């Protein structure tokens, strides 16, 4: 196993536990979401310092619309609060913002702020802070299949020409090139499931789970998980010679 194989270039995090964090402190759920928002800034800077190239954060799923209306309204306003508060810090640290998801379904104010964040950081060359917002992996894969099907129907593509790489290119992470698939997925709050997140891209990703709720997950926790990842034996379906 070469050292290069265990470089952590793309880290994905399911930021879970904001509500539980608030409940433990006898506070409303929105307080947990607010604290979770502030932690995004801290973890982004920590990931940047660790040399991570892409940080993908699961911020709002296509299923989250089923939550109480007041909570959804608060979550839709979080990008506005986040970028208004932290855009100067992101610019100072050369962070490039990307938002993937079905953005045209967002409220107008939310849509405008995420588009502005991407536009203002488009020339930054550091860590890519990639938010999955109004995102669902099954829908993403379905959309990719429809795109490829349309190409076949138009005659610009033959079905036998479709490859796994081509499917990857048509997913929302396709623009990340060689970094499009996460090396490591971390989920906070002790839950151990992937919740319709990056189902195709996580095929050979390493998985890790933290008992801490997202607002409590700090830079030391991140470094501990990154260090542990670097010592894992990533097989990618192959046989480890040391086991034979």
Curated annotation (Swiss-Prot):
S-S bridge residues: none
Keywords in alphabetical order: Magnesium, Metal-binding, Transferase
Active site: 16, 64
Pfam families (UniProt xref): Prenyltransf (PF01255)
GO molecular function, one term: manganese ion binding
UniProt cofactor note: Binds 2 magnesium ions per subunit.
GO CC terms: cytosol
The protein's Enzyme Commission number: 2.5.1.-
Subunit record text: Homodimer.
Protein name, UniProt field: Isoprenyl transferase
Naturally occurring in which organism (per UniProt): Lactobacillus acidophilus (strain ATCC 700396 / NCK56 / N2 / NCFM)
Taxonomic placement: Bacteria, Bacillati, Bacillota, Bacilli, Lactobacillales
Gene: uppS
């Amino acid at each position: 196993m070469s050292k290069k194989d265990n470089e952590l270039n793309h880290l994905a995090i399911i930021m879970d536990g904001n509500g539980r964090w608030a409940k433990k402190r006898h506070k409303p759920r929105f307080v947990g979401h607010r604290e979770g928002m502030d932690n995004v800034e801290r973890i982004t800077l920590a990931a940047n310092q660790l040399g991570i190239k892409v940080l993908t954060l699961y911020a709002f799923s296509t299923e989250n619309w089923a939550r109480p209306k007041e909570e959804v309204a608060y979550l839709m306003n979080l990008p506005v609060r986040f970028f208004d508060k932290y855009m100067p810090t992101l610019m100072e640290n050369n962070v490039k913002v990307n938002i993937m998801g079905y953005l045209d379904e967002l409220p107008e104010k939310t849509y405008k702020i995420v588009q502005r964040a991407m536009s203002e950081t488009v020339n930054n060359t550091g860590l890519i802070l990639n938010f999955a917002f109004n995102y669902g992996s099954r829908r993403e894969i379905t959309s990719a299949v429809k795109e490829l099907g349309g190409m076949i129907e138009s005659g610009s593509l033959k079905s036998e020409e479709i490859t796994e790489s081509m499917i990857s290119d048509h997913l929302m992470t396709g623009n990340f090139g060689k970094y499009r698939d996460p090396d490591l997925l971390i989920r906070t709050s002790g839950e151990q499931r992937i919740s319709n997140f990056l189902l195709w891209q996580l095929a050979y990703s390493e998985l890790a789970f933290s008992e801490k709720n997202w607002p409590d997950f700090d830079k030391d926790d991140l470094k501990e998980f990154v260090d542990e990842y670097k010592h894992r034996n990533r097989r990618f379906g192959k046989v480890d010679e040391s086991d034979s």
